[in-house]
Amino acid sequence: ATIIYPSPIFGPIHSRRLGISLGINLQPADGKSCSFDCIYCECGYNADHRPTLPRPTREAVREALEAKLIEMRDSGTAPDVLTFAGNGEPTGHPHFAEIIDDTIALRDKYFPAAKVSVLRNSTFVHRPQVHDALMKVDNNILKLDTVDIDYIRKVDRPVNPHYNVDDIIAGLRSFNGHVIVQTMFMKGRMGTDDVDNTSDRFVAPWL
């Protein structure tokens, strides 16, 4: 079953990686909007979940986040992390940089020990305002499933036909180590296509 997350705030949930995670979803609450259309996405395919609602505004995100943090404080539940995730690519929001600033300010006010994490697919690493915002967060978690462009087009299915993996790699390097690279290794078939990326052909260049 696919998952469409509430917006702009969901959880908290218990993450094996991150601990008690309060989710921040910058996509519409009724669908998926993403610069990738990955075959393994838990939110399903883009075409099957077209949103009709707009993205939440910067103000709506700030107000909802503060209300939830107050609720968690009053209940004695401290988040380990505030995580940007949800129904698509968070850095595609037109006010992503400002929302990051708001989130850090609210984190510092209510739960200064909590981390701020961003889970993203690396599509917009070339945008200066996105890059600068990600340098401010604690966990800048970027996806790169492989360096093989044919595999990326088959499995990650970027919406932009001009997607260039060399540009993405250059973008990852531009963070000078302030980055966590995550990948999806898998075996299997998608229809008639082999989607195994665990062989040396894929792993050696990735390393």
Model feature map: region roles:
Residues 33, 74-78, 110-113:
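Short helix-terminating capping/connector loops at secondary-structure junctions
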Residues 1-17, 63, 70, 193-207:
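Auxiliary Fe-S-binding modules of radical SAM enzymes
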Residues 83-89, 121:
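Glycine-rich beta-strand-to-loop/alpha-helix junction loops that act as flexible
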Residues 26, 84-86, 183:
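Short glycine-centered, acidic/aromatic-flanked micro-motifs in structured strand/loop junctions
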Residues 45-81, 98:
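Conserved alpha-helical substructure of the radical SAM core
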Residues 31, 89-90:
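Short strand->helix junction
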Residues 92-207:
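Conserved AdoMet/S-adenosylmethionine-binding subsite of the radical SAM
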Residues 17-60:
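Canonical Radical SAM [4Fe-4S] cluster-binding loop centered on the CxxxCxxC motif
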